C-alpha cells in the first residue's frame, strides 16, 4: 500500500461494504493496539482480505509465531476449538468464547469429529461433567470444497449455527458457520 492521490473527496465518501450485500464492511487495516491486534484478529481480518498491524512492543519471536499461525490457517474455514471427549464442560465453557462461532468440536485422537458442544448443552450439568456425556453426536460434517451456497442452505435447513469441515480422510480441518459461508 502506497499513499497516493485519489479522486475521493472525503473519507466519508469511501464505501467499504462487501459485494455480497450482507451489510458488513471490511476493515482495511486493524490498529496496532495490544488489546485489538492479536493472533485471532489477524486470522479473521486476513481471511477477509484486510491487514493487521501488530503492536511494536511485542517480542519478535512472538510476532514470528503469529505470522506463522496466520499463514497456516484455512482461507475460508474458521479455526475450530477442539477438545477430547474426556475433557470437561468447564474446560469447554472457558474456551468457547474465544471464537465467534461459539462451538467446540469434540474429536478423537486422529482429529475425527465425534460431536459438537454449544453453551446451551451445558445447561443442567456441572462443570466437571465430561463432554461425551453432553455433546450432540448428530453431526452435519461438511466435506472440504463443498459449495458455499449449499453449506449455507444445509446449515439453515437443520437450524445449525456451525458445522465441522473434514477432509477426504474424515479429519477435521475447520469449522463453517452460516455467516462464514455467506461472507466467503
Describe every region a protein language model picked out:
Residues 6-8, 41:
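Terminal-region recognition feature
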Residues 21-58:
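Active-site cofactor/substrate anionic-group-binding motifs, chiefly glycine-
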Residues 9-33, 62-101, 106-109, 113-116, ...:
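Bateman/CBS regulatory modules and CBS-like beta-alpha motifs in cytosolic regions of diverse proteins
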